[in-house]
Every structure is written in structure tokens, then in C-alpha cells.
Amino acid sequence: MPTGCSDTYPRLIGDIGGTHARFAVIDSPGSPPTRFRTLCCDDHAGLLEAVQAYLLLERGLAGPRVAAFGIANPVEGDRVRMTNHDWSFSIEQLRIELGLARLVVLNDFTALALSLPRLQAGERRQIGGGNECAGRPVALIGPGTGLGVSGLVRCGNGYAPLEGEGGHVTLAASTPREAELIAVLAARFDHVSAERALSGPGLIALHDAIRQLAGAPPLALEADEISARAMAASCPWCAEALQVFCGMLGSVAGDLALTLGAFGGVYIGGGIVPKLGDFFDRSDFRRRFEQKGRFSEYLARIPCYVILAEYPALLGAATALDNALAGETGT
């Protein structure tokens, strides 16, 4: 339930990734977010400057009283140094510089997890079978600039988000071909985590490794171009890279579902998978998700959903702000 203290509006909410910073405003109790804008992180020296640029663009906006930002980084203590960007800031100093009475900063995938109970039927697409069980744990995984992992567990009348860095678990091969590719990645990285393959940079690394093993000359392609060529079936190396990506993601998502007992469903977010459409539906994702030997039938009962909502993490940031303010007022 949104807290209704009128003196805390307008509220600023943000979703800060390694590539883009997305902002919106909630004008009054119970109203949906409005004034959506997406800014490029590289265009701004830091988060303060990005927020100031957003507020300047929204000329008719009264100064926000409180704010909540989901950020692609662990949040421990006051100092935040982003993993996939060079921004660094003090939460308290940022609050003062923005003139806010309250500033909540949380991990972006924690924010995304908090949004899941608020998703409407048309804001998710099921992949494969299974039926969600109300009140059971929910898992969340999402490749983007990095690999985000989170979840929800029942707590009282609502859910509590799980905060961790599951994208950095060790990546395991399930096929001889994957073992070859991981060996190539191991020559580049001290630790081949899941994120080293299951992210935008990871898709590029897989494509590079496939070309290297084929004896083909290097070809610098961005992740979006690799995906586009794969879906158009215009490049066999791109097609294999994306197929391997989807299969590995299924395996890692299955591990997560087993760890949490995620009968509330496994949700796939991030900036890559929602753009893949039917390619992802036809990929090895679901087969590999269920392919866990003695526990294959267990996983077959767990549904998987691709998140289709345009700005879900902003809804989660709004929920985190509601919870923080409700805790302060005892409501």
C-alpha cells in the first residue's frame, strides 16, 4: 500500500544501470509514475549530474521531497562505487545536494524483485509449462550490462527481497562445446562467472570465443548486433553465440530455482531477453532449465516468465520508498 503522506510528494524514482539512468515521478498518493525519461550514463559525470539533468528537462516539476534509486551495484553503507560504470557517490551527500528529506538507494535487482507482485498479466510472458504457487519463493534473473539475480520470500502479508550477487557464481559447462568456450574465457578472466557469459559483454565474449575456435578473424560487434544477426539467421557464429547464451541462461536459472524452491515462478528481466521474442521461446532455455537429472520433474512444475513491462524497476523503487517511509511513520 502506498503511504499517503502528502508532504512527501512529488517523489522521484530512478533505475540506474551501467548504460542508462531511467527516472520518473509520482505526483500524489496512489498515482502511477509519470514523466518517464531515459538518460545515457556516459553523458553525465555522475548520478548527481544525471538527476539534475532530468529535473532540468522536466521544467514544470516541483522539487521532489523524497527519492528512491535502484542501482546496478551492491549497496552496503554510505559509499557506492558502481561495478559497470565509473560513477561513485556518498548516499548522504547526494541527498543533501539534491535537497531531499529522504533518499533510499538499493540494488537495482532488489528493486526489480519488489516490482514482481505488481506486474499485470500482460506484463509477463510464460516460457514453457508449470503453474505458480501463491506464497512460495520467487526467483529473478536478468542479463543486461551485468547479470542481476534476486528473489522474493514471503514475509508477513507481503514479500521480502533477497539481496545478493548471484551473477558472480562460477559458470559450469553442461556440454563439451560449452567446456571449450569456457576454456577460452578462462584464458581472459581470472574467474569465469555466470556474468562473464550471460550479459551484454558476455554475449560479445561468447561470439569472440566461437570465432576464435573456428579460426575466423576477429569481428567487433556489439551485443545488439549479435542478437539481430542471430535472429535474422544471417551469421552462423552470432546464431551459435545466442543459442549458447540462452542455453546457459536456462541452466543457471534452473540452479537458482532449485536453490530457492521457486514455485512462485522464475522471472527473466534485464535488457537482452525481452527483446529476443520468439527466438528465446524456441531456444534451449526451457529444456536446459528442466535438465537437472533426478530433479527434472521438480523443475518442470516451476513456471518461467519473461518480464515485458517497460519500467518495472521503477515500480520496485517506488515500493522500497513506500516501505521505508511507512517504517519511519509506524504505519
Curated annotation (Swiss-Prot):
Listed GO biological process terms: glycolytic process
State whether keyword Heme applies: no
Q: Which Pfam families match?
A: Glucokinase
UniProt-annotated binding residues for ATP: 14-19
Reaction it catalyzes: D-glucose + ATP = D-glucose 6-phosphate + ADP + H(+)
State where the protein is found: Cytoplasm
Q: Which residues form a coiled coil?
A: none
Q: Does the keyword Nucleotide-binding apply?
A: yes
Query: Which GO CC annotations does the UniProt entry carry?
Result: cytosol
List its EC numbers: 2.7.1.2
Keyword annotations for this protein, in alphabetical order, are: ATP-binding, Cytoplasm, Glycolysis, Kinase, Nucleotide-binding, Transferase
| Gene Ontology molecular function | ATP binding; D-glucose binding; glucokinase activity
The similarity annotation says: Belongs to the bacterial glucokinase family.
**This chain belongs to which protein, by name?**
Glucokinase
**Source organism of this protein record:** Aromatoleum aromaticum (strain DSM 19018 / LMG 30748 / EbN1)
